[in-house]
Design a protein with these regions (language model features):
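Residue-level detector of conserved, well-ordered beta-strand and adjacent loop positions
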Residues: 3, 59, 115-116
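A generic structural signal for short coil/turn motifs at secondary-structure boundaries
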Residues: 9-13, 146-147
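Nucleotide-sugar donor-binding patch of glycosyltransferase catalytic domains
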Residues: 50, 89-166
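A short, mixed-charge helix-start or loop-turn motif at secondary-structure junctions
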Residues: 5, 56, 141-142
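Bulky hydrophobic/aromatic packing residues
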Residues: 4-5, 37, 77, 152-155, ...
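Donor-binding and catalytic core of enzymes assembling or modifying cell-surface/extracellular glycoconjugates
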Residues: 13-103
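Short regulatory "switch" loops immediately downstream of catalytic or recognition motifs
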Residues: 4, 35-47, 126-136
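Conserved donor-binding/catalytic core segment of Leloir-type glycosyltransferases
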Residues: 1-10
Length: 167
């Protein structure tokens, strides 16, 4: 189960091929990848984010109970720093969280957290960075979202493989 959409571009996995490679990899392992985002595409004109090809589309504005039921049936969850990742964690599912904008201490503890600390990261928790909710493209340090762009598929694959070994 995957969640690829969020409420600000800084929260996305901005690696242009990341989700495509991840879904292809999971499909090659025999997994049916189900996308449970609210929307199949989201963003602003000129910067839209789309559900990856190869996913089963269960997007929609569904009740929380339906999402809990979806999560109950998944082996593990891959998502962003968002509410559904927290919900999956609360449901006891292993969560592979892809997030560069938030600090480790600001999210639930997970052995499968994916962050690249070799580049700009954790602006969300830096009190000198003032979040501008009216600016979809908010990147306070003007690094073009390198915090998540520089999270490679290989980094995510490593966490997927670790997770699969434990379930």
């Amino acid at each position: 189960m995957v969640l690829t959409q969020s409420t600000a571009q800084a929260k996305y996995w901005n690696n242009p091929d990341g989700w495509k490679q991840t879904v292809e990899y999971l499909n090659s392992l025999g997994y049916e990848v189900v996308c449970i985002d609210k929307n199949s595409s989201y963003g602003i004109e000129g910067n839209m984010n789309y559900m990856p090809e190869g996913c089963v589309d269960k997007t929609g504005d569904l009740p929380l109970e339906d999402r809990i039921n979806d999560l109950f049936h998944c082996e593990f969850f891959i998502g962003l720093g968002s509410g559904l990742s927290w919900l999956a964690w609360a449901c006891g599912k292993p969560v592979i969280m892809i997030s560069g904008f938030s600090a480790d201490y600001a999210e639930f503890s997970s052995p499968y957290r994916v962050i690249n600390k070799d580049v700009c990261n954790s602006c969300w928790n830096d009190i000198s960075c003032k979040f501008d909710s009216s600016n979809w493209m908010w990147c306070p340090r003007e690094k073009s979202f390198e915090c998540s762009k520089k999270i490679s598929f290989e980094m995510v694959k490593e966490k997927i493989d670790q997770c699969i070994k434990t379930i």
